[in-house]
Structure formats: structure tokens, C-alpha cells
């Protein structure tokens, strides 16, 4: 993979987390495989490639790529507005998080505890999802900037759905961090749209 493709895997994962959070908010549904991929990305240490963070297969990120492409194409009929809003908010929150070494330390130790829960219960167990959601509440939710997720209140008010959404936002922010570590910048979304789209078309065609 080229450096740009590596970046797009991580950025596609930010959008994937946003798409899944939006889906839960609107329908109350999310596939176990999708949830597993994003939760698993929080716990991967020392991956060989960026794709290894997401199960080694970018089919896991296809909905995120689709949402990212529609955002870069600026096609009003295809644009997924809420996922785009959530994605940009996650990228912004990651910048704030980067200035908080104390919070990053807390997150690292809490994720170690969650890894132990995963070994005991499995990746998509309610206890693991609740722990990830709780970690988001105790850290990212304390920033002044908040992500307001819009959807059907019948689904948003269910504690399990709320925990899933928070866990996905946490995974999205982790992916935004990876994207930036790989050289990603917000200005690329404005000034390098053509290059990003060409690379994305190639990635989604294969």
C-alpha cells in the first residue's frame, strides 16, 4: 500500500465508525461483524500494516469508504450528512485529545483492562461495549466540544445502543489519531480531493 492508501484506510475507519453510529441512532441495528471490527481496532497493538488494525480486510470498511467518497465528491444526492458531521467532529476531538497526555495515559490503562474483559467475555459482549462506552464518557465527553448524535429517540434512549454509539465514537477517534500519525491532515480533504478520490476509487475497485 502507498502512504496515501494507508492514510485512507484509517480515515475510512473514522467514517465507518460514524456510519455505524448513525445507523444505530436511526434504526437501532448494527451487525456484530461491523461492531467487532471497530471495537477490535481499539485493542490492536503493534500492527504490521494499517489494515491489520481493522481485521486485515478493507471490506470491513466499505461503508466508511462509501461515505468518505460521497463527502469528497460533494454530490448532494449521495452525501451522508450526519456521518460527515460526526467524522469531522471526531477528527477535531482527536486534536484536543492529543494535547492531554494525562487523558491518553488513562485511556491506555483502561484499554488494557478492557482487553482482559475481552479475553474473558468476547469482543462484542455487553460488558465490553459498556466498558468502552464508559471510557468515552469519562474522557472524551468531558471536552467542551461534544458530538450530538441525532436519530430516533426510541433507539437513542436504550442504554445498550447509547453504549454502542459511544464505543464507536471512541474507535473513530482512535482511527483519527492513527490517520494523523500516518500524515493525514484536515486540509487534504479540501486541497487534495482529486488525489484522495483517485486512490479511493482504486481501493474500492479491487
UniProtKB/Swiss-Prot annotation:
The organism of origin for this protein: Ectopseudomonas mendocina (strain ymp)
The protein's name: High frequency lysogenization protein HflD homolog
A Pfam family matched in the record: DUF489
GO annotation, cellular component aspect: cytoplasm; plasma membrane
Tree of life domain: Bacteria
PANTHER family tied to this protein: HIGH FREQUENCY LYSOGENIZATION PROTEIN HFLD
Keyword annotations from UniProtKB, A to Z: Cell inner membrane, Cell membrane, Cytoplasm, Membrane
Entry membrane topology: Peripheral membrane protein
Family note: Belongs to the HflD family.
InterPro entries in the record: HflD, HflD-like_sf
Gene: hflD
Localization annotation: Cytoplasm; Cell inner membrane
Amino acid at each position: 500500500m502507498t502512504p496515501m492508501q494507508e492514510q485512507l484506510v484509517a480515515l475510512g475507519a473514522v467514517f465507518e465508525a460514524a456510519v455505524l453510529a448513525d445507523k444505530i441512532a436511526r434504526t437501532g441495528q448494527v451487525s456484530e461483524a461491523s461492531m467487532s471490527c471497530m471495537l477490535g481496532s481499539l485493542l490492536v497493538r503493534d500492527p504490521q500494516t494499517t489494515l491489520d488494525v481493522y481485521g486485515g480486510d478493507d471490506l470491513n470498511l466499505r461503508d466508511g469508504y462509501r461515505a468518505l467518497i460521497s463527502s469528497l465528491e460533494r454530490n448532494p444526492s449521495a452525501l451522508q450528512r450526519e456521518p460527515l458531521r460526526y467524522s469531522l467532529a471526531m477528527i477535531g476531538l482527536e486534536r484536543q485529545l492529543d494535547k492531554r497526555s494525562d487523558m491518553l495515559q488513562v485511556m491506555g490503562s483502561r484499554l488494557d483492562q478492557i482487553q482482559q474483559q475481552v479475553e474473558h467475555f468476547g469482543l462484542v459482549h455487553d460488558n465490553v461495549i459498556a466498558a468502552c462506552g464508559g471510557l468515552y464518557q469519562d474522557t472524551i465527553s468531558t471536552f467542551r466540544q461534544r458530538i450530538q448524535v441525532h436519530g430516533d429517540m426510541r433507539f437513542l434512549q436504550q442504554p445498550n445502543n447509547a453504549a454502542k454509539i459511544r464505543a464507536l465514537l471512541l474507535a473513530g477517534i482512535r482511527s483519527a489519531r492513527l490517520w494523523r500519525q500516518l500524515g493525514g491532515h484536515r486540509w487534504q480533504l479540501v486541497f487534495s480531493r482529486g488525489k484522495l478520490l483517485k486512490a479511493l476509487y482504486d481501493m474500492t475497485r479491487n
